[in-house]
């Protein structure tokens, strides 16, 4: 099913060359616009609310949250599918190769956090921000890589993408455990139940698209309601998607 949903990894990065440039241009425009005399319009747009749903089932989010919670969940889903393929049958399929980005990501989180703590030891109120330097912006990481095109070996792109994903997941876990004060445990249990159902369908060899799609939406909804960042739902869904260890899978 992975091959059905997404194209091969090399093809993914060929398309990313164009999108990386668009991402860079969009970031520059956003920086200039938000710091200009009409910057208030930029923030007004981000804070504009849009709703979808019927009757009592309505999802009302600002443009900012549609981007951060919905579109980024889809982004994490697609990228995690690609990395999952590499862990199963690609560049990261051997244990030693798979361990390298994991170690790199852990070091990339621990070292900046440690430096921050050392610098801010004497100021108690700023010490609470130790998790800030541990995060990586995965979208920009992949965007910068894509700008280099074929000049960067595909194995290096895979490694850095895996490292960025693991680093981002680590940051989400840190936020969930150390910064989330209002976790909704009912939603957390429903999120876990949805994920277990997806895993069960996978183990049964069930490969139809719509059950995964429908339960995936529920998984996102429960994750969003739990107080954990919604992007984790994209990662969990990608992990549960069936994969056949062959090019025809």
Where are these regions (language model features)?
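Entry/N-cap segments of selected transmembrane alpha helices
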Residues: 86-113, 184-193
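Transmembrane alpha-helix boundary signature
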Residues: 33-45, 58-67, 78-94, 110-131
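Structural signature of hydrophobic alpha-helical transmembrane segments
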Residues: 65-76, 124-139, 180-193, 231-233
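Short helical (or helix-break) motifs at transmembrane helix termini and adjacent helical loops
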Residues: 111-112, 133-159, 167-173
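C-terminal ends of transmembrane helices
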Residues: 6-10, 77-93, 142-153, 196-207, ...
């Amino acid at each position: 099913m992975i091959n059905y949903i997404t194209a091969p990894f090399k093809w993914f990065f060929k398309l990313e060359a164009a999108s990386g440039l668009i991402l860079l241009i969009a970031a520059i425009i956003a920086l200039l616009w938000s710091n200009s005399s009409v910057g208030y319009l930029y923030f007004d747009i981000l804070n504009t609310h849009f709703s979808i749903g019927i009757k009592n089932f309505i999802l009302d989010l600002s443009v900012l949250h549609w981007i951060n919670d919905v579109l980024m969940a889809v982004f994490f889903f697609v990228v995690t599918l690609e990395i999952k393929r590499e862990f199963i049958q690609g560049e990261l399929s051997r244990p030693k190769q798979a361990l390298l980005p994991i170690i790199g990501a852990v070091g990339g989180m621990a070292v900046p956090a440690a430096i921050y703590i050392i610098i801010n030891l004497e100021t108690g109120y700023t010490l609470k921000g130790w998790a800030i330097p541990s995060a990586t912006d995965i979208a920009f990481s992949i965007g910068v890589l894509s700008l280099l095109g074929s000049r960067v070996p595909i194995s290096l792109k895979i490694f850095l993408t895996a490292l960025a994903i693991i680093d981002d997941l680590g940051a989400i876990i840190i936020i969930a455990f150390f910064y989330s004060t209002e976790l909704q445990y009912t939603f957390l249990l429903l999120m876990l139940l949805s994920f277990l159902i997806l895993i069960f369908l996978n183990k049964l060899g069930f490969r139809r698209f719509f059950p995964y799609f429908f339960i995936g939406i529920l998984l996102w909804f429960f994750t969003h309601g739990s107080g954990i960042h919604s992007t984790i739902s994209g990662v969990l869904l990608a992990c549960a998607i069936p994969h056949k260890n062959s090019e025809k899978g």
